[in-house]
Amino acid sequence: MNIQSIETYQVRLPLKTPFVTSYGRLEEKAFDLFVITDEQGNQGFGELVAFEQPDYVQETLVTERFIIQQHLIPLLLTEAIEQPQEVSTIFEEVKGHWMGKAALETAIWDLYAKRQQKSLTEFFGPTRRKIPVGISLGIQEDLPQLLKQVQLAVEKGYQRVKLKIRPGYDVEPVALIRQHFPNLPLMVDANSAYTLADLPQLQRLDHYQLAMIEQPFAADDFLDHAQLQRELKTRICLDENIRSLKDCQVALALGSCRSINLKIPRVGGIHEALKIAAFCQENDLLVWLGGMFESGVGRALNLQFASQPTFSFPGDISATERYFYEDIITEPFILEQGTMTVPQGLGIGVTLSQTNLLKYSQYQKIM
């Protein structure tokens, strides 16, 4: 394929309600949409989902914009691309910056599938048309209000609830939820809020039949996670420190976890994500798909990727209305009896809403 143009929309979508984690508060989701057009007029869409603050991982929206325009796009234009798997090799000389790489790499995958007149799901092997999904709930100090949120999620049919926790907000809300919902698939996510000194408190969580405890310790730690996993019956899940297949291999070798939260942007794109999914399946690591408050473009990709049979555990792929009043695609994603339908159109299978793009974004033609 020959790239004819690259455009970007800098988008800001307000959230319906603020989302609070152990490291911050999110009131709107800022992201960039990249549109890559080939010589045939096909367009591939990729979403740059890095947050504005470096409080989740190192990348930010501003740093990745710079890396994309000054380094990755020039590399992408050095030669004609035949297969989307080539992109990760082309980008190898740039160290790190996985989310910037993923924004362009996923756009190339979408473009490639459209050139082949195929859905992107056809490149993922056997897939399902509908997949079970879960919901993530932010820190809610008002515990009666938290119970209402859980009740609403259950009534809507979400098949798993994840609760964000931090020191001082952990055992009490978990115990309350478990008291009212004894059979609910429930997990917690600490976003690196704890240290090994908090072991006694984390051991208390072992009594509530949690599906897993996600990322209790630092994003660069494997050793303390391994010690914690030896101490707990509950499965430990790693998120922030899984940036590559090599990180999964290290985690397995050390016994740092028994589950992986896989986020396509966090590992540099689809090619690396496919290798990680295969590795987890081969080594009995429970792998599931996480989210980054994506718009409909990233959400479509997540649904397609999670349609692989490997992803049996419900991921963080909520309905559009969970977070946003409006989206940048024409058809919102809807929850139906705890499942969501995987888009089957060409590429990622969604159409952009030009009206909403004009309403919520600033346009820039890069080339």
UniProtKB/Swiss-Prot annotation:
Cofactor (UniProt): a divalent metal cation
One GO MF term: O-succinylbenzoate synthase activity
UniProt similarity note: Belongs to the mandelate racemase/muconate lactonizing enzyme family. MenC type 2 subfamily.
Catalytic activity line of the entry: (1R,6R)-6-hydroxy-2-succinyl-cyclohexa-2,4-diene-1-carboxylate = 2-succinylbenzoate + H2O
SUPFAM superfamilies: Enolase C-terminal domain-like, Enolase N-terminal domain-like
Active-site residues (renumbered): K164 (proton donor), K263 (proton acceptor)
Keywords: Isomerase, Lyase, Magnesium, Menaquinone biosynthesis, Metal-binding
Record's protein name: o-succinylbenzoate synthase
GO biological process: menaquinone biosynthetic process
Species of origin: Enterococcus faecalis (strain ATCC 700802 / V583)
Pathway in which this enzyme or protein is active: Quinol/quinone metabolism; 1,4-dihydroxy-2-naphthoate biosynthesis; 1,4-dihydroxy-2-naphthoate from chorismate: step 4/7; Quinol/quinone metabolism; menaquinone biosynthesis
Binding site for Mg(2+): D189, E214, D239
Assembly behavior: Homodimer.
UniProt cross-references to Gene3D superfamilies, sorted A to Z: Enolase-like C-terminal domain (3.20.20.120), Enolase-like, N-terminal domain (3.30.390.10)
Transferase is among the record's keywords: no
Function comment: Converts 2-succinyl-6-hydroxy-2,4-cyclohexadiene-1-carboxylate (SHCHC) to 2-succinylbenzoate (OSB). Also acts as a N-succinylamino acid racemase (NSAR) that catalyzes the racemization of N-succinyl-L-phenylglycine. Since the gene is encoded in a menaquinone synthesis operon, OSB synthase is probably the physiological activity. A pathway that requires NSAR activity has not been identified in this species, so whether NSAR is also a biological activity is unknown.
Transmembrane segments: none
